[in-house]
Structures are given as C-alpha cells and as structure tokens.
Amino acid sequence: MKRNFYWKALFSQSGSEIYEISTRVGRFPDTIITNKPLEDLDKINPKLLEKAFDRFIFIPKKPTVEEYREAIKHTDIVTLHGFLRVLPPDICSRYKIYNGHPGLITKFPELKGKDPQAKVWWRNADTPYRLHGHVIHEVIPEVDAGKVLSEKSFQTESLYREFNSLDSYIKRLHDLAIENWVEFIKNRITIPNSFYAY
C-alpha cells in the first residue's frame, strides 16, 4: 500500500501553477516555499493565498544553503514551479527535487535554459519545429540536465497556422505542463482527507 508522501513546492512568480495542479490533484503541497518578498503578496495568486497561506514559508530572494535546508527539511519530494534560482549542489544531492520545463529537451537539447517557447517561436521560420512538449526532470546543479522522468508532447504541421501568437503557444504548453504535473504527482502521492484542495 502506497504511503502518504510529504510534498513541498517552490515558486518565485505567482504560484498559479501550484494552485492549478493542487485543485486537479485534490490536495495542496504540505509546504509552499517562495522567495517572493512579503511586500509582493499582491503578485501571488489570490486563490492560492486564500486556500493555502497557512502552508507558506518565505525565504530570502537569494537563500543560503542553510536557509534552503531549513525550509526543505523533512520531505519526500520537492517540486519547482517557476522557481528562479539555481539550487546549490548540496541541496540537489540531498533531496528528490523535480522541475518542469516547457521544451522537449529529450529531442531538442538546444531548448534547455530560459524561454524555450520563444526559441521555438522565433526560430520556426528558419528551422520549423513540429514536435513540442513539456518534461519533468530531476534537478541537478546543471540547468535542465537532470534525468527526464515524464514528458508529454503534441505535433504541429505549421506552428504559425495553429497558433496565432506566441502567447497562445505558451498557453498550450502551460496546459500540457499542468497535465504532466498532475499525472506525475498523483503517481507519487496519496491524498489524505485533511489536505483536500477545493
């Protein structure tokens, strides 16, 4: 029988991805860690604040190894959702940490790093991409270089005909990311009644 896992999630932006995943998984992370300053609460998804603020831990914008350890300790898995810091090697090796990436780096390693959606969009006129996707990979000190554990993809015949803007393409990849995360997390975490997300 699968036991309950303790799940912590980190973000630096709005936390909206965590909220969307949680409502579909049926529970929130046990702890939600952000390096967003308290004065920027208005930039965090209001529904996430309303439903799960008691799970929040605020860390400095540039945490030390000790600050990471204190926030992450006593957990089974850690997921990153728009967390804009490269984690120290000691933290990567100490915990099971997973990150999502909106580029099919298993097929196109050039999409590693920042803004892969824009890379695909702006290069498409010269080098058309017909396979697109989202991956979840283990976090190691090198950016987007950890083992890929889950991926979802879709095909296009013509990117510019099927999407009328970069924003619409990003939205499609975002929806795919939510699907990928939900399946990934459900396969690892059982859902105790006290943690249901509504």
Walk through the language-model features, giving the residues of each.
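One-carbon transfer enzymes
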Residues: M1-Y198
